[in-house]
Amino acid sequence: MQAGKPILYSYFRSSCSWRVRIALALKGIDYKTVPINLIKDRGQQFSKDFQALNPMKQVPTLKIDGITIHQSLAIIEYLEEMRPTPRLLPQDPKKRASVRMISDLIAGGIQPLQNLSVLKQVGEEMQLTWAQNAITCGFNALEQILQSTAGIYCVGDEVTMADLCLVPQVANAERFKVDLTPYPTISSINKRLLVLEAFQVSHPCRQPDTPTELRA
């Protein structure tokens, strides 16, 4: 199959999509964005066309090299294997395990508990409290872990997959008005990452589907 420009099905505010956008930017991969609005039309992810593409009806979804990949960490790992520069997983097995541990903690242990589909089930009056509790519980653990793994970034002094997970999750925390004062390590790493070009161009405020009032 002829492989053209990669296509990323993404929602500007999706933290999972943001992880992949950062990876694509870091690796210098040119791609086309197809916006999937998770709110408009009762959720465009529920359309028959998108469900045929991704049976889980979630973003991100990436078409690349003639295949379709779902789930942000699986996408990033594929990009790492096929386009390994710059490296997002350390060569050292112990550091690589730390990167995967932190990535899984965020992608599997924090974000799913406060995502849109869960908050809809909680009920409007409880959404903010629920999200704050989920993020705070996860950040309590993450702050402690980072104190032993961090250098300039989450694991040592090079940007890794863990950092791609951290920044979008801090943005979620800020959106849900979580007090970040108890998390100085998380906050300082996040601040250092946000000045990097790949994190800026992939930011939710600079996407094709970003509403005008949220653009920067």
Swiss-Prot record:
Principal place of residence: cytoplasm
GO biological process: cellular detoxification; glutathione metabolic process; L-phenylalanine catabolic process; tyrosine catabolic process
Effect of residue 32 to E: In allele GSTZ1*C
Annotated Gene Ontology cellular component terms: cytosol; mitochondrial matrix; mitochondrion
Cysteines engaged in disulfide bonds, as pairs: none
GST N-terminal domain ranges (all copies): 4-87
List of residues binding glutathione: 14-19, 45, 59, 71-72, 111, 115-117
Cofactor note: Glutathione is required for the MAAI activity.
Domain of life where this protein originates: Eukaryota
Residues recorded as bearing N6-succinyllysine in the entry: 57, 177
NCBIfam families: maiA
Quaternary structure and partners: Homodimer.
Known function: Bifunctional enzyme showing minimal glutathione-conjugating activity with ethacrynic acid and 7-chloro-4-nitrobenz-2-oxa-1,3-diazole and maleylacetoacetate isomerase activity. Also has low glutathione peroxidase activity with T-butyl and cumene hydroperoxides. Is able to catalyze the glutathione dependent oxygenation of dichloroacetic acid to glyoxylic acid.
The protein's name: Maleylacetoacetate isomerase
